Amino acid sequence: MTAADLPDDAVLVCIDMQVGFDDPAWGDRNNPEMEARVADLLAAWRAADRPVVHVRHDSAEPDSPLRSDGEGFAWKPEAEPVDGEPVFTKRVNSGFIGTDLEAWLRERDHSTLVVCGLTTDHCVSTTTRMAENLGFDVYLPADATATFDREGHDGERFSADEMHRTALAHLNREFATVVESADLSATR
């Protein structure tokens, strides 16, 4: 899979690239290079004049670092939208629920999405699953996503890397084609 294999109008969908995910309350995160890989994808998409959309989370939880009235709602500097790139704000894990994302994509006849951002096992996964269920062809660059350590119902701890790899395995070949960002960032 290379950038040349994608349709010219493949949409880069950047999920929750927000400063609030730098809050230590989230715990340990995997993939410290995720922001750089997202920046590479953004640069490639913009240079090729391909469509880019941004989805961000506005949490209703009073203590969330992702509330719209807090500093954590801001974009990470590596992934700030530029003029003309639509922004969709969601209140749940899916970028499609409560937003106009699906309508925007359908009005422009986009059928292929490349999904990146945070977090692999929550909002990236949910948006990817819904996109496929809605009939979109989805590519997921593994190194342009990341997640955090999690605790199971019984107190067992799972590392961020375990969660990341497991989430990608669940999505691969059923909801998305999992690739590496370098394949998609290559010059067309």
UniProtKB/Swiss-Prot annotation:
Q: State the coiled-coil residue ranges.
A: none
The record's Gene3D superfamilies line, in alphabetical order, gives: Isochorismatase-like (3.40.50.850)
One molecular function GO term is: hydrolase activity
Q: What is the top EC class of this enzyme, as a single word?
A: hydrolase
Record-listed E.C. numbers:
3.-.-.-
SUPFAM superfamilies given in the database record: Isochorismatase-like hydrolases
InterPro entries reported for this sequence: Isochorismatase-like_dom (IPR000868), Isochorismatase-like_hydrls (IPR050272), Isochorismatase-like_sf (IPR036380)
Which residues are the signal sequence here?
Answer: none
KW Nucleotide-binding (keyword) present: no
Cross-link entry Glycyl lysine isopeptide (Lys-Gly) (interchain with G-Cter in SAMP2), positions: 90
Pfam families according to UniProt: Isochorismatase
Keyword annotations from UniProtKB, A to Z: Hydrolase, Isopeptide bond, Ubl conjugation
**Into which family does the record put it?**
Belongs to the isochorismatase family.
What is the protein name stated in its UniProt record? Uncharacterized isochorismatase family protein HVO_2328
